[in-house]
Amino acid sequence: MRYQNMFETLKKHKKMAFIPFVTLGDPNYELSFEIVKTLIISGVSALELGLAFSDPVADGTTIQASHLRALKHASMAKNFQLLKKIRGYNHDIPIGLLAYANLIFSYGVDGFYAQAKECGVDSVLIADMPLIEKELVIKSAQKHQIKQIFIASPNASSKDLEQVATHSQGYIYTLARSGVTGASHTLENDASAIIKTLKTFSSTPALLGFGISKKEHITNAKGMGADGVICGSALVKIIEENLNNEDAMLEKIKGFVGGMIS
């Protein structure tokens, strides 16, 4: 219900969803919690939280570096502890996890979804799992009332987009471009055709990700028919550039989010 409530409220105010991505435990668990608190206080719509992994193939150098920083002290137990703490801090904000398949399968699919539910997680997106393998997780997701998110990529066929639109719950992660994550100066591709196709199959909101780093990108995304954006690399870069000054880091995150959602 949290995603539904969020999108309904945004629609009422004619606003786009702004969802930040950060890696849990980057640069450490204490500061990671402060970063998430700052994001919530700054007015983000929902959270997309990454689980650190040693080979994050869908990510560019900025987010890869955040995985490596977090991996110095990361564990699944600590990740779940932090998620519980975040949910305890705010009961209403939707929390999504972005994970790589290996982490989930080595933990045990059903156990992972059960634990995610217990921590107050609303959705799971598996970055490197093709749609064809969806049956491996969908039953556990449904059993534990976790919304499974799928990715709509620029080179997907109409049939694939129909599958993505039909099976995605909460929202559809729509790629602004092929390749890996990373902040861009411009949105290279017009995703309006993909979004239009998705909306013929389902009313599930489409969020645009990959390369979102400026206010004008949100305006562009709105023009393409997107219901919101997911912004990762630009935020993670602020963390990377201010590792030695926590106060400055949190202030800059607050300023960045404020500029994006104003």
Curated annotation (Swiss-Prot):
GO molecular function: tryptophan synthase activity
PROSITE patterns reported in the protein's UniProt record: TRP_SYNTHASE_ALPHA
Active site residues according to the UniProt entry: 48 (proton acceptor), 59 (proton acceptor)
Record's keyword terms, sorted: Amino-acid biosynthesis, Aromatic amino acid biosynthesis, Lyase, Tryptophan biosynthesis
Chain segments annotated as transmembrane: none
PANTHER family recorded: TRYPTOPHAN SYNTHASE ALPHA CHAIN, CHLOROPLASTIC, TRYPTOPHAN SYNTHASE, ALPHA CHAIN
UniProt record similarity statement: Belongs to the TrpA family.
Superkingdom, natural source: Bacteria
Pathway: Amino-acid biosynthesis; L-tryptophan biosynthesis; L-tryptophan from chorismate: step 5/5
Catalytic activity: (1S,2R)-1-C-(indol-3-yl)glycerol 3-phosphate + L-serine = D-glyceraldehyde 3-phosphate + L-tryptophan + H2O
EC number: 4.2.1.20
One Pfam entry name: Trp_syntA
Protein's gene: trpA
Quaternary assembly: Tetramer of two alpha and two beta chains.
Signal peptide: none
Main function: The alpha subunit is responsible for the aldol cleavage of indoleglycerol phosphate to indole and glyceraldehyde 3-phosphate.
InterPro entries, per the entry: Aldolase_TIM, RibuloseP-bd_barrel, Trp_synthase_alpha_AS, Trp_synthase_suA
Protein name: Tryptophan synthase alpha chain
